[in-house]
Curated annotation (Swiss-Prot):
Enzyme Commission number(s) from the entry: 4.1.3.4
Cofactors demanded by this protein: a divalent metal cation
InterPro entries noted in UniProt: Aldolase_TIM, HMGL, PYR_CT
Record keywords: Lyase, Metal-binding, Mitochondrion
Subunit structure: Homodimer.
Function: Involved in the catabolism of branched amino acids such as leucine.
Protein name: Hydroxymethylglutaryl-CoA lyase, mitochondrial
Amino acid sequence: MQWNGVRRAHSIWCKRLTNNTHLHHPSIPVSHFFTMSSLEEPLSFDKLPSMSTMDRIQRFSSGACRPRDDVGMGHRWIEGRDCTTSNSCIDDDKSFAKESFPWRRHTRKLSEGEHMFRNISFAGRTSTVSGTLRESKSFKEQKYSTFSNENGTSHISNKISKGIPKFVKIVEVGPRDGLQNEKNIVPTSVKVELIQRLVSSGLPVVEATSFVSPKWVPQLADAKDVMDAVNTLDGARLPVLTPNLKGFQAAVSAGAKEVAIFASASESFSLSNINCTIEESLLRYRVVATAAKEHSVPVRGYVSCVVGCPVEGPVLPSKVAYVVKELYDMGCFEISLGDTIGIGTPGSVVPMLEAVMAVVPADKLAVHFHDTYGQALANILVSLQMGISIVDSSIAGLGGCPYAKGASGNVATEDVVYMLNGLGVHTNVDLGKLIAAGDFISKHLGRPNGSKAAVALNRRITADASKI
C-alpha cells in the first residue's frame, strides 16, 4: 500500500510541475526533480557554460554551499524539501496528505534580496546554505563552505564520531614525497606552480622539497631553485626534508624555515633507505636537532615502517614507540607515523598508536598512510577516533617510497578532505581548488588523477554540463 501512495504522489507532482509554470523552470525536465538528490537540485544551469572548471567544482561538489540563482528560477517560487524518516506526509493539499509518502513539500515566494536558508542532509551531516538572490544574480560574492553546522557531527552515529577532533590539520607532502620517485624529471616551474596552487587551496603545511643528495633522489636536485621561488609565499609553512647536517645547512642557506628528519622503526629498512642503523640515524639526527635549535628552526620527525617493513614484515609497536620517543626527546615538535608500504589495517594501526601514545602525547603525532591495499582512509578514521588530529596526504595520490617495492600511492589529499567534510570536520581547505591542483599535476605527468573523489566529482560536472 505504501508503494501505491508513492506512485500516486509521483503522479500528482508530475501534474503540478507540468501545469504550473511557477513551480519549475522550463529549461529543466520534470523528471529531473525525481532523479536527483537534495544536493543536485536545479541551480541555474544556463550559467554553467561560462563558468570555469574550478567554479563548477566548487558549485557542484558535495561540500560546496551553492546559492540559487534568481534568474535561473525566473524570480518565481522556490521549492523546499525536507527528507523525513516517517511514512506520513505533510502537505497543503489535504487529499495529498492522506497518502503515505516519505517526504514533505512546501513552497513559498521569496522577495528579491531575501535571505534563503535550506538544510541539506548529505553523508550523515547537515550544512546550512545561505545566500541572497541579489548576490547570486551577479555571481560576484558567492561564498562556499565545507563546514558543518554548529551541531558538528551530531547527525553521525556516536560510534563513528566519538573522539574525532573538530579540526584536522592536513600536511601536504605531494611536492616532495609525491614527486621524489618520478622517473621523468619534473620542471622546476611546474613544481613551483603546484606548490602555489596547494597553498592557494588553504592547506596550512606544504612540504616543498628535500635537500638530499641528487645521487639518491635526482628528481629533487633543484631543491634550492624551488625554495628560492616559493620562499615569499604567504599562508602556509613550507618544510623541507633534511637527512643530515649537510642537508640542514643547505636548507637553511636556501631560506628554509622548517625542516624534517626521517628515521625508521625497521633496522633493515633504515639500512636500505638511509644507509645506517636505527641508532646511527638517531645519533645523526640529534646533531641536526641541535643545529636547528641554535637557528630557531622547528624540526618535524618522520618514522617509517610503523606497522610493516618490505624486508622484515610486521614491525612490533614497541619498536615504533621507542623511535618516536627518541625523536620527541631530541626536540621534534611533531612526529609523523608512516605506513611506508601501505600494509596496515585498523587492526594493526590501533595497537601501534596505543603503544606510541603511551610515551608521546597524541597532539604531537601525525599519521601518514599509503593506500597500496586500499586501507588508508579506514586507518585515518580510526586514528582520528583515537585522538590524532594531524594527517599527511599527497595531492592526486602521488608518490610512495622509492626504496619500498610496491609502496606507490600515498592517500590522496582530495579523498581525505572529502571524507573529513562528510564527518563535519573542519580543515579550512577549498576542495575545488584542491581538485584543480591535482588535475594540473596529473595532466603534466600524463596520468589519471589518483583521487577517487576528484575523478567522481569531475565526472559529475561533465555529466551535468552534457544535459545543457
